[in-house]
Amino acid sequence: MRCPFCGNGDTQVKDSRPTEDSAAIRRRRFCPACNSRFTTFERVQLRDLVIVKKDGQRSAFDRDKLARSIRIACRKRPVDEDSIERIVNGIQRRLESSGDTEINSKAVGELVMEGLRGLDPVAYVRFASVYRNFREAKDFEDFVETLGGSAD
C-alpha cells in the first residue's frame, strides 16, 4: 500500500483486526520513509454497483458519499461512528446481495431512511427533509404526524 503522505510504496502493517461487525479488516500501517502512521480498511466487494439517479445519470456507488450523507443527518446527535458504519455496511450488503448491478437512487434513499428511523428520530427527519425535498414547515408537520408524533 502506498503511503498517502510521501507516496512510498513500501509500507508495513503494524496491526490488523476485524471491525466490530466483521464486515471489514482494519489495518494500522507504518511508512518507514516518513515515519507516518495511517489506517486502511479492507472490505469484500461482491460486484460493482452503479447508482441510477432521477435524471437517468449513472455513477459508481460511493460508500464514502453514503456515509457522509448519514453523518450530516446525525450531526450534533448522540450517534456514534460505529452505528453509522453499521448502517452503511448493511446498506452496501443489501445492495450487493440484491443481484442487481444498477440500483435506483430512490432505493438507496429508502434504505438510509430505514436505517436512520431505528437509530435516531431527529436524524431520520433531517435526512427525510432533504431526501423528500421538504419546502415548507407544513411538510415537516405532515411527515412527523406519519411517525405517530405530534407536530405541536
From Swiss-Prot:
Key word DNA-binding present: yes
Record keyword Zinc present: yes
InterPro entries per UniProt: ATP-cone_dom, NrdR-like_N, RNR_NrdR-like
Keywords for the protein's UniProt record, in alphabetical order: ATP-binding, DNA-binding, Metal-binding, Nucleotide-binding, Repressor, Transcription, Transcription regulation, Zinc, Zinc-finger
Cofactors, names only: Zn(2+)
GO biological process: negative regulation of DNA-templated transcription
Biased amino acid composition, Basic and acidic residues: 12-21
Molecular function (Gene Ontology), one example: DNA binding
Manner of cofactor binding, per the entry note: Binds 1 zinc ion.
Region (Disordered): 1-21
Superkingdom of origin organism: Bacteria
Residues of the ATP-cone domain: 49-139
Zinc finger (unnamed): 3-34
Function: Negatively regulates transcription of bacterial ribonucleotide reductase nrd genes and operons by binding to NrdR-boxes.
HAMAP family per UniProt: NrdR (MF_00440)
Family per record: Belongs to the NrdR family.
PANTHER family hit by this protein: TRANSCRIPTIONAL REPRESSOR NRDR
Protein name from the UniProt record: Transcriptional repressor NrdR
Source organism of this protein record: Rhodospirillum rubrum (strain ATCC 11170 / ATH 1.1.1 / DSM 467 / LMG 4362 / NCIMB 8255 / S1)
Gene behind the chain: nrdR
